[in-house]
């Protein structure tokens, strides 16, 4: 391709090689429609398409968010109720979603299959450029909000998917803090309103305002199109032009993101947030001290990432230490945000009280001034720079398509008419920042952007009991008044509208409409699965598992310690160990020096606790603590040295440090517990059902309960060092560990030579691996919060009723998630979503999230067997669900994920042929196989294992459903 030539209406303006991502970028403009396009040519088979629009709302009605939902509810070529859902059911996509940001809305898809990729592009382009919602107000009612009234004498209520989703968001204290912070920092721009929607304002949105927002924002002239991967780009350009863009003429768009004028002086404000009537209020205040930064170059953006890591993220972070030691908060963190037009930097403290507000500002400013006057610790900065650089070079996004990460990064410049490719380059910036370590580069950055900057806000939110109840009463009173002003005819119109919406939601799409969605053939599916090679060797009596992988010069190491040698009570201390590993003193030095060393030489060091079930076994599992580390191969000696130090030389005697970490852990849980709702309630149900379920709950809600108790019991904290040391001695033995090493051929020998002399110093005491006896929970729990919505879970174990895990169960998961539960719980019930999972140990769970209902959702679960017995599908529909299921089984594997995959198969005893057989069962699934699962589901549901977390009144109104009512805090 040549610059200034036109290809299917696209003028090629620029070609640029980007070595950092091993790709070549082509920047183009569609001459007729005004659409912008960037294509990155890369050998990656995981192709990505994205179309984004600059969306700049002027209020908090959530119009941009409701638009994102609504355009995916039918279009010109695909006149179904929800083409998006039909795609999810039957696509081999590796990513399919839509995202609303404060100033943009993105519609990305990805797939490795060429036909599938084309189909995804076609459906998404038709959705955003020709949506049915332009002329169909009922879609906005369903996805946004509407009055609901089943009978004229009933109470008037609000319902809507986004309305309930955002009620859930606003139930998390950190979301409330974020919203208030943005409102105070940007009172005059789009960032001062909530693009996602504030539940108090969503119901102000009119359909006419919605239509106008679409007209202004959803035109190709306001679009940003992105293509990435190994493809025939000229074919893709021809498709974009012929099918879509050639039918539009360029227009002048006025969606620019305005600049907030800098403040002449900072602000200090505080707001209440709601907690449950029995939740504690002490140490539950959250603070955010934020700055809007002056013009920031891409190099300075990267420097701020380094600075934030050094000041607030590392265990040696001086600003974090100053705030924690002054008792400002139990957990101190911060972040730098450059995905908006005016970047911002913030320091946050949780586990605090409102009377600490002034102290927080004073300590932040005085500490930064002192650091500038005396000079920042250059070793600490270099360690943080190395950590950030490693993440850039590794480019691992947990299996998500890498092209998606690139376009999200590019939009941070592209959206504001700056150079989009500039942000994909980082080598020159790294060189300049590294040079700056020897001077006052970072000190100057702090002075210019923070200390001499009055565009700052200190926002605090404090807990207030009864606040949500008062708000609910106000809404109820308002709706009563609204209804009282209605004429009988208006009331009847809402009753009829409610009926119409429900009939619409219940009515199936026509066969003709369903056939409009392109579908792959079963012959496009591969029943085979890539084998991840794993080779065993020995260092003394310790097994080493080598997973040979092309890793771009990075090694991944995992120490898998068996926890079967512990008692159930000791698992709590193992969880604490996992949480603090690498963050406490060792016999060789203090934790600050250790943290610098880790960041200087490693790409990361972490630990987690997990349980891997034995394949097909009801209650057999391996409980594990996994200590992971990663580094460049050239740093392998440092990796081995450091992982040995944190495991074998940890010093648990620093009472003050342990107390800080316990308080920090509790503060994090206080802040995030509601967001973890679906995980909490699902595992709480499983804790009634199986030993592995109780084990997982011990590290989840059970851990939160115990860490809260420990944090509030000064008498117990002095006993902690001895408990931790005792549990560590039991776990960290040479004959109690399996070692994973991921690297390239020829690297294993170096690793074994480095680890051998270290392992030889480890304890080899023989302990029984039959100590761990798990006691299940009894009774259904209702976990009460100040939240506005619920998480509702029910489950059990089908092995108890004589059944085993088979392929059709995975197909049923897809059917339930995107058909039965989607329609009954999301579309009709107004929840954000629901899912079902069937596991090979027999455990089975149904769970809804951000759900306005409780008893109604349990009834949906109860009626599932009847739905299954009446289940019928055409061959085409069955094929669709099979394809969608195979997509969920075929998640991409990055080098970082290959080792854990191989170790998972090792500990579970799963054979490759077992996985292939399971996939064959999925591909061969027939409707009658789904019908037969009614007999599996019904007895499990009758076992009546339930857990809900959510609104206090809803849980109390459910009556005898719950045996135990527990406060979240």
Task: Show where each model-derived region lies.
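Hydrophobic, small-residue-rich alpha-helical packing segments that form membrane-like cores
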Residues: 151-222, 226-244, 248-275, 281-283, ...
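Generic recognition of flexible, low-complexity loop/linker segments
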Residues: 95, 211-215, 274-277, 319, ...
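M16 family metallopeptidases and their MPP-like homologs
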Residues: 46-56, 82-130, 137-148, 175-200, ...
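Active-site His/Glu-centered metal-binding helix of metallohydrolases
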Residues: 63, 67-71, 577
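His/Glu-based metal-binding/catalytic segments typifying zinc-dependent metallopeptidases
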Residues: 41-43, 50-52, 163, 167-171, ...
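Extended, regular secondary-structure scaffolds
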Residues: 212-214, 224, 233-251, 374, ...
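Non-catalytic terminal extensions that flank enzyme cores
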Residues: 1-48
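Non-catalytic, conformational "gating/processing" segments within enzyme and secreted inhibitor domains
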Residues: 159, 211-243, 721-755, 942-943
């Amino acid at each position: 391709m040549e610059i200034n030539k036109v290809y299917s209406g696209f003028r090629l303006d620029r070609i640029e090689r980007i070595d950092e991502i091993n790709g070549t970028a082509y920047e183009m403009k569609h001459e007729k429609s005004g659409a912008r396009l960037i294509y990155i040519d890369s050998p990656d088979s995981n192709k990505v398409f994205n179309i984004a629009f600059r969306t700049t709302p002027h209020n908090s009605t959530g119009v941009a968010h409701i638009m994102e939902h609504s355009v995916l509810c039918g279009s010109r070529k695909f006149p179904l109720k929800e083409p998006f859902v039909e795609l999810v059911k039957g696509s081999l996509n590796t990513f399919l979603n839509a995202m609303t940001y404060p100033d943009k809305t993105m519609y990305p898809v990805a797939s490795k299959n060429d036909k599938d990729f084309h189909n995804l592009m076609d459906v998404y382009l038709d959705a955003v450029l020709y949506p049915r919602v332009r002329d169909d107000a009922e879609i906005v009612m369903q996805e946004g909000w509407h009055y609901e009234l089943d009978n004229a004498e009933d109470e008037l209520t609000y319902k809507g998917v986004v309305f309930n989703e955002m009620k859930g968001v606003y139930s998390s204290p950190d979301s409330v803090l974020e919203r208030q912070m943005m409102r105070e920092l940007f009172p005059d721009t789009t960032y001062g309103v909530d693009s996602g929607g504030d539940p108090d304002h969503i119901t102000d949105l009119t359909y006419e305002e919605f239509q106008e927002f679409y007209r202004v924002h959803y035109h190709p002239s306001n679009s940003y199109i992105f293509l990435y991967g190994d493809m025939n780009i000229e074919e893709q350009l021809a498709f974009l032009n012929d099918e879509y863009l050639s039918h539009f003429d360029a227009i002048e768009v006025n969606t620019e993101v305005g600049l907030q004028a800098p403040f002449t002086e900072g602000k200090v404000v505080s707001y209440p947030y709601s907690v449950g009537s029995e939740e504690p209020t002490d140490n539950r205040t959250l603070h955010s001290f934020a700055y809007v930064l002056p013009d920031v170059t891409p190099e300075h953006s990267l420097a701020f990432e380094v600075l934030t890591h050094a000041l607030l993220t590392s265990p040696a972070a001086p600003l974090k230490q100053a705030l924690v030691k002054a008792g400002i908060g139990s957990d101190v963190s911060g972040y730098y945000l450059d995905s908006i037009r005016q970047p911002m930097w913030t320091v946050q403290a949780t586990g605090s009280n409102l009377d600490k507000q002034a102290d927080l500002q004073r300590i932040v400013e005085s500490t930064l001034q002192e650091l500038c006057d005396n000079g920042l610790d250059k070793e600490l900065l270099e360690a943080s720079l190395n950590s950030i650089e490693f993440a850039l070079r590794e480019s691992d996004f947990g299996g998500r398509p890498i092209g998606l990460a690139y376009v999200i990064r590019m939009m941070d410049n592209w959206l504001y008419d700056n150079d989009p490719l500039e942000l994909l380059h980082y080598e020159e910036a790294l060189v300049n920042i590294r040079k700056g370590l020897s001077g006052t580069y970072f000190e100057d950055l702090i002075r210019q952007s923070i200390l001499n900057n009055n565009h700052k806000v200190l926002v605090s939110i404090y807990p207030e009991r009864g606040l949500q109840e008062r708000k609910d009463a106000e809404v109820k009173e308002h709706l009563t008044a609204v209804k009282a002003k209605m004429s009988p005819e208006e009331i009847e119109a809402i009753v009829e509208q409610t009926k119409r919406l429900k009939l619409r939601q219940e009515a199936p799409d026509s066969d003709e409409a369903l056939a409009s969605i392109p579908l792959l053939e079963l012959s496009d599916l591969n029943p085979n699965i890539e084998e991840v090679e794993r080779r065993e060797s020995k260092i003394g009596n310790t097994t080493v598992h080598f997973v040979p992988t092309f890793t771009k010069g990075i090694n991944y190491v995992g120490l898998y310690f068996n926890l079967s040698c512990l008692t159930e009570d000791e698992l709590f201390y193992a969880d604490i160990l996992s949480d603090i590993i690498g963050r406490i003193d060792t016999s060789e030095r203090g934790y600050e020096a250790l943290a610098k060393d880790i960041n200087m030489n490693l790409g990361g060091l972490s630990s987690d606790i997990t349980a891997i079930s034995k394949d097909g076994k009801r209650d057999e599992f391996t409980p594990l603590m996994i200590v992971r580390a990663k580094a460049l191969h050239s740093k392998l000696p440092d990796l081995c040295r450091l992982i040995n130090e944190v495991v074998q030389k940890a010093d648990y005697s620093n009472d003050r440090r342990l107390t800080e970490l316990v308080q920090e852990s509790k503060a994090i849980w206080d802040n995030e517990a509601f967001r973890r709702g679906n995980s909490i309630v699902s595992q709480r149900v499983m804790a009634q059902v199986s030993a592995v379920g109780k084990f997982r709950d011990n590290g989840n809600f059970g851990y939160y309960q115990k860490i809260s108790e420990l944090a509030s019991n000064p008498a117990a904290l002095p006993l902690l060092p001895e408990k931790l040391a005792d549990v560590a001695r039991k776990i960290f033995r040479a004959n109690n560990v399996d070692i994973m090493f991921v690297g390239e051929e020829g690297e294993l020998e170096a690793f074994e030579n480095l680890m051998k002399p270290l392992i030889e110093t480890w304890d080899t005491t023989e302990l029984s691996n039959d100590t761990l006896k798990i006691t299940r929970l009894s009774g259904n729990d209702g976990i009460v919060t100040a939240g506005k919505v619920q998480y509702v879970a029910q489950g059990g174990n089908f092995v108890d009723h004589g059944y085993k895990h088979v392929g059709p169960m995975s197909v049923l998961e897809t059917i339930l998630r995107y058909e039965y539960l989607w329609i009954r719980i999301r579309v009709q019930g107004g929840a954000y979503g629901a899912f079902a999972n069937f596991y090979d140990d027999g455990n089975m769970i149904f769970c809804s999230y951000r759900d306005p209902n409780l008893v109604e959702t349990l009834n949906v679960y109860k009626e599932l067997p009847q739905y299954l017995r009446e289940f019928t599908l055409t061959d085409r529909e069955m094929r669709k669900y099979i394809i969608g299921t195979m997509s969920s089984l075929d998640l991409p594997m990055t080098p970082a994920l290959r080792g854990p995959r191989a170790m998972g198969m090792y500990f579970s005893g799963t054979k490759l042929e077992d996985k292939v057989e399971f996939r064959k069962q999925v591909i061969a699934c027939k409707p009658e196989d789904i019908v037969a699962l009614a007999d599996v589901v019904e007895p499990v549901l009758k076992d009546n294992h339930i857990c809900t977390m959510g609104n206090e009144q809803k849980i109390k109104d459910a009556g005898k459903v719950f045996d135990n009512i527990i406060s979240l805090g």
